[in-house]
Amino acid sequence: MSTITTSSVASSNGMRKNGKNWHDSKKPFRPTSGLTSYEKRLEARKLQEAVKEHEREMREEREAERKAQIQKIKDRRAAKEEKERYEKMAEKMHRKRVERLKRREKRNKLLHS
């Protein structure tokens, strides 16, 4: 009977690939595996995600401010160009005609936008 039990124990482990069954089977070397509990890891992960979310919000806010500033500059430049264009037109033609063209262009701009 003793031979049956020893063979069943040996067969449960299986044969080693190199055939040295007299050596103990090695276990993986994980020195830090049991140091922190699962709850602590979950808590740290939640904290990290909250920090990342806050950073993402701050980044988006900064980007929105930047885009608003860029749009403001573009609008200012467009207004300046339009003003210069009307001044050039005023040099060439009468003041009343320039005002009439301004009104017409504003109407068209409102219709198309």
From Swiss-Prot:
Protein name as catalogued: rRNA-processing protein cgrA
Principal localization?
nucleus
- Source domain of life: Eukaryota
What is the protein's known function?
A: Involved in nucleolar integrity and required for processing of the pre-rRNA for the 60S ribosome subunit.
Please tell me the species this chain comes from: Aspergillus clavatus (strain ATCC 1007 / CBS 513.65 / DSM 816 / NCTC 3887 / NRRL 1 / QM 1276 / 107)
Q: Where is the composition biased (Basic residues)?
A: 93-113
Q: What keyword terms does UniProt attach to this protein? A: Coiled coil, Nucleus, Ribosome biogenesis, rRNA processing
Q: Name one GO cellular component term.
A: nucleolus
* Cellular compartments annotated: Nucleus, Nucleolus
Member of which family?
A: Belongs to the CGR1 family.
A Pfam family that this protein carries is Cgr1
